């Protein structure tokens, strides 16, 4: 298997290439079923952090968290306490309070969970607040992309082994009021399934794929929370095969899915779904791909790059002693002035953020469990 090129801090990645991200310090152990979130920077011009929560390996489930500090390019292990061990859970950050991280559901070795826990980043302790309303039944529900505003939306999930939970009810948790509800929906919802992806784009929720027993799905459903009507979308293009345990993120008008498994085994393909055109595209890469995997995590992160500014202010007529005009219409006449100003301009640079897709961990169908970070550029470059 070919190794991926390592992307260094502030290095600008090339389009259509995968890279390895290798922060310094102690990285998490190999794991599956964890979640991954981007935490915006608390200070001006900061790069932010990536937090990985929970997960499991054959020895047990985890109650830890790891952070990648994008400013220092280092792993950090926060001393947060109180998280119940869990994997294949959901996590989200409310829009109105970016200092709070919520987790829901998942499982540990003794069975499925349906509890909620809250971490306030300033306090640094996981809490189990009292909530009202009827919660979903215990289930696995592996996502970090199913929240709109302050609300987490839950549909389907795993019961035991290959079997999904029986209900096809939409469950909504409002973190502002600490309330569960089951709003009435219209139209035909997706069939019972687990291992699907559920991704929010604006006021719409998209569900793709999943598994029920031995049946893999490749369908795509949409629910607009403004009218609460389910719609099975008629998609076209490079439609992915039926798959489950894949990951999804949304950026702009596109949804990206990576990996998972189908009837042939683990996958390492990336597909892009155009929401407006209802069309799938399988993305092609000029580099090796990450190892095939399922039950990993994925998120969008900003990546600070440093770009050299090229000189665009001067026109060379072939005679440096002649009067020259820059693009602003100002005249310059001395060769020394021209050369010095060109040197100053060419030596300057600017910083900007581009968007990358990051995947961490997961496993293949042969039992190989990963602890690697892989990234690729996604924003308007395909």
Give the predicted meaning of each segment.
Residues 1-382:
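Kelch-like beta-propeller repeat domains
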């Amino acid at each position: 298997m070919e190794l991926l090129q390592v992307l260094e801090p502030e290095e600008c990645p090339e389009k259509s290439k995968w890279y390895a991200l290798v922060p310094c310090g102690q990285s998490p152990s190999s794991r599956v079923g964890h979640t991954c979130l981007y935490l915006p920077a608390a200070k001006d011009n900061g790069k932010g952090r990536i937090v990985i929560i929970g997960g499991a390996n054959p020895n047990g489930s985890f109650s830890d968290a790891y952070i990648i500090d994008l400013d220092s390019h280092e792993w950090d292990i926060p001393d947060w306490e109180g998280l119940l061990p869990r994997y294949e859970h959901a996590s989200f950050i409310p829009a109105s309070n970016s200092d709070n991280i919520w987790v829901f559901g998942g499982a540990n070795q003794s069975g499925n969970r349906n509890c909620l826990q809250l971490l306030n980043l300033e306090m640094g302790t996981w809490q189990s607040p009292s909530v009202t309303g009827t919660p979903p039944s215990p289930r696995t529900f592996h996502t970090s992309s199913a929240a709109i505003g302050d609300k987490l939306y839950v549909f389907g999930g795993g019961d035991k082994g290959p079997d999904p939970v029986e209900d096809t009810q939409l469950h909504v948790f409002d973190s502002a009021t600490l309330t569960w509800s089951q709003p009435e929906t219209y139209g035909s919802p997706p069939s019972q399934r687990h291992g699907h992806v559920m991704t929010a784009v604006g006021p719409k929720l998209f569900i793709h794929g999943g598994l029920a027993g031995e049946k893999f799905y490749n369908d795509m459903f949409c629910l607009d929370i403004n009218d609460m009507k389910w719609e099975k979308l008629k998609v076209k293009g490079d439609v992915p095969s039926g798959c489950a345990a894949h990951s999804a993120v949304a950026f702009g008008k596109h949804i990206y899915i990576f990996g998972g498994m189908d009837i042939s085994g683990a996958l390492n393909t990336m597909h892009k779904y155009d929401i407006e055109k209802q069309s799938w595209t399988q993305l092609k890469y000029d580099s090796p791909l990450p190892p095939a995997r399922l039950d990993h995590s994925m998120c969008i992160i900003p990546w600070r790059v440093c770009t050299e500014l090229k000189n665009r202010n001067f026109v060379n007529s072939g005679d440096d002693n002649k009067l020259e005009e820059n693009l602003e219409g100002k005249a310059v006449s001395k060769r020394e002035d021209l050369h010095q100003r060109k040197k100053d301009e060419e030596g300057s640079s600017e910083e900007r953020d581009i968007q990358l897709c990051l995947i961490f961990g997961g496993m293949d169908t042969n039992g190989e469990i990963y602890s690697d970070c892989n990234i690729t550029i996604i924003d308007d470059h395909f």
